[in-house]
């Protein structure tokens, strides 16, 4: 175990906070519940942003920006929406030394301000579909906060789309869910379950919500992304109508969807270890760190440094994200540990022996410290690419193996009962696949007795036959296979 961070097994929460602070991802701000995202943490968010932004544009979305100050009356127009968010509102009642005629709410989410504008912009079927994304901050007055996972203010993207038909809006909702799934699995190397939320767990103001659920190393679930089908709810609340091809006036159908800096928390909790942060290569701000191993002689050090610069130049020319650590005051061991703590995927060591042999020594962040070998400069680019690709795949497979190991099926039978289910969730946690009758009462009782919620009705198990299956709690006829878990 590192001297610098808590043991993951002994104190998971402190281990997580140690990595956040000591890897310089974020720090606490003077405002309770808020965080300062430090440059290294923000560089991860910037990478997430750039990849997703490209994917949104490829699917026909444009970026815009809407005010963070929302008239309170806008939020009152959609009853379920205000009921769901009002406990978290931050409200401004005074400004400029005077009381405001109407209170303003700091943006908890932007459906209302955006749909107010859509009522001005959408008049004809020619204006549809309208597909806008916004990169912004939001404020939700959370009582229990933790950096990246749940903070009073956080960064996110939120997409808001308007469509002529219900089919188009539903297609958009599921399209974006798939974009998120592919991004989280392919770039963050986090295996996920996708599925529909229960009525209790859906977004306030949505007809239906679809979520992406991941399993952290402490066996708690984390909601990594959501996509909502809003139906006509916001179009009716803000009277957004269009004239169709037959000249009839009709309300538009809607979707909204988003991910946030919570994804950085997921990266930490899925991949990191007691040496610090572990970042999948495709999302790492720095893919490769070159560390010259200096000697006492200046002449030798100059040769090592010149050679190291050539290595860096070759890697940059091949478009790798690479940095060099030229710190002559710190020992190689200290610099190795520093690179490990930051989660840099590949470390290249350059000593005088490497210079003489025209080689470098390569090691990987996700491997044991004994894993290292020399490669010739001629094969540098190909070998680095191979190791980066392998690390990306290995991290995903390791996380998938962990999820498989910690996903248990418990159904009512002669062997298992609700008591079996309850004991397992309370003692062990992880994902539990079970059956549910659809009753809110059963859902509430299970949550109260186990602290586990229905994470989603998973797509992976839609094809399974429910014939003869009964609700894990009440033994009534089952309507759904569902995933239960304790969660963040």
Curated annotation (Swiss-Prot):
Q: Which GO cellular component terms, listed alphabetically, does the Swiss-Prot or TrEMBL entry include? A: aminoacyl-tRNA synthetase multienzyme complex; cytoplasm
What S-S linkages are listed for this chain?
A: none
Keyword match DNA-binding: no
Catalytic activity, reaction form: tRNA(Pro) + L-proline + ATP = L-prolyl-tRNA(Pro) + AMP + diphosphate
Keyword ATP-binding in record: yes
Q: Which GO terms describe its biological process?
A: prolyl-tRNA aminoacylation
User: EC number(s) of the enzyme?
Assistant: 6.1.1.15
* Primary subcellular site in the record, as a coarse category: cytoplasm
Family annotation (InterPro entries): aa-tRNA-synt_IIb, aa-tRNA-synth_II, aa-tRNA-synth_II/BPL/LPL, Anticodon-bd, Anticodon-bd_dom_sf, Pro-tRNA-ligase_IIa, Pro-tRNA-ligase_IIa_arc-type, Pro-tRNA_ligase_II_C
Q: Which UniProt keywords apply?
A: Aminoacyl-tRNA synthetase, ATP-binding, Cytoplasm, Ligase, Nucleotide-binding, Protein biosynthesis
Q: Where in the cell is it found?
A: Cytoplasm
| A GO term for molecular function | proline-tRNA ligase activity
Q: Give the protein family.
A: Belongs to the class-II aminoacyl-tRNA synthetase family. ProS type 3 subfamily.
Query: How would you summarize the oligomeric state and partners of this protein?
Result: Homodimer.
Record remark: domains: Consists of three domains: the N-terminal catalytic domain, the anticodon-binding domain and the C-terminal extension.
Known function = Catalyzes the attachment of proline to tRNA(Pro) in a two-step reaction: proline is first activated by ATP to form Pro-AMP and then transferred to the acceptor end of tRNA(Pro). Can inadvertently accommodate and process cysteine.
Q: What is this protein called?
A: Proline--tRNA ligase
The scientific name of the source species is: Borreliella burgdorferi (strain ATCC 35210 / DSM 4680 / CIP 102532 / B31)
């Amino acid at each position: 175990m590192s001297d610098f961070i808590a043991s993951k097994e002994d104190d998971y929460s402190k281990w997580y906070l140690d990595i956040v602070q000591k890897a310089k991802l974020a720090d606490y701000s003077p405002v309770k519940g808020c965080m300062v995202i430090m440059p290294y943490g923000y560089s991860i968010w910037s990478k997430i942003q750039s990849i997703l932004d490209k994917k949104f544009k490829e699917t026909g979305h444009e970026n815009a920006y809407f005010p963070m100050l929302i008239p309170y009356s806008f939020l009152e127009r959609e009853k379920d929406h205000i009921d769901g968010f009002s406990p978290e509102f931050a409200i401004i009642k005074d400004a400029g030394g005077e009381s405001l005629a109407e209170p303003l709410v700091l943006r908890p989410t932007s459906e209302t301000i955006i749909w107010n504008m859509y009522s001005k912009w959408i008049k004809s079927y020619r204006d549809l579909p309208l597909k806008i994304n916004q990169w912004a901050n939001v404020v939700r007055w959370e009582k229990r906060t933790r950096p990246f996972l749940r903070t009073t203010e956080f960064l996110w993207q939120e997409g808001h789309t308007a469509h002529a038909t219900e089919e188009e809006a539903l297609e958009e909702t599921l399209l974006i869910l798939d974009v998120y799934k592919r991004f989280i699995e392919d770039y963050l190397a986090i295996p996920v379950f996708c599925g529909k939320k229960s009525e209790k767990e859906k977004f306030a103001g949505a007809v239906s919500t679809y979520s992406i659920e991941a399993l952290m190393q402490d066996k708690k679930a984390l909601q990594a992304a959501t996509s909502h089908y809003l139906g006509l709810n916001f179009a009716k609340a803000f009277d957004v109508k269009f004239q169709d091809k037959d000249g009839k006036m009709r309300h538009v159908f809607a979707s909204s969807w988003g991910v946030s800096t919570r994804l950085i928390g997921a990266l930490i909790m899925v991949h990191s270890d007691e040496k610090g942060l572990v970042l999948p290569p495709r999302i790492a701000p720095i893919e490769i760190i070159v560390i010259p191993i200096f000697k006492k002689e200046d002449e030798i050090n100059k040769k090592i440094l010149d050679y190291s610069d050539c290595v860096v130049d070759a890697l940059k020319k091949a478009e790798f994200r690479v940095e060099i650590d030229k710190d002559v005051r710190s020992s190689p061991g200290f610099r190795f540990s520093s690179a490990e703590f930051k989660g840099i995927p590949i470390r290249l060591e350059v000593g005088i022996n490497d210079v003489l042999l025209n080689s470098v020594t390569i090691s990987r962040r996700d491997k044991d410290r004994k894993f290292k070998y020399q490669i010739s400069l001629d094969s540098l680019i190909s070998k680095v690419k191979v190791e980066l690709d392998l690390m990306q795949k290995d991290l995903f497979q390791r996380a998938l193996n962990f999820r498989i190991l910690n996903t248990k099926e418990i159904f009512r039978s002669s062997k298992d009962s609700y008591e079996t289910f309850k004991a397992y969730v309370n003692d062990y946690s992880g994902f539990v696949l079970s059956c549910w009758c659809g009753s809110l009462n059963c859902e509430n009782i299970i949550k109260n007795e186990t602290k586990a919620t229905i994470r989603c009705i998973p797509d992976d198990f839609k094809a399974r036959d429910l014939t003869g299956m009964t609700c894990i709690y009440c033994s009534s006829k089952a309507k759904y296979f569902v995933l239960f878990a304790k969660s963040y």
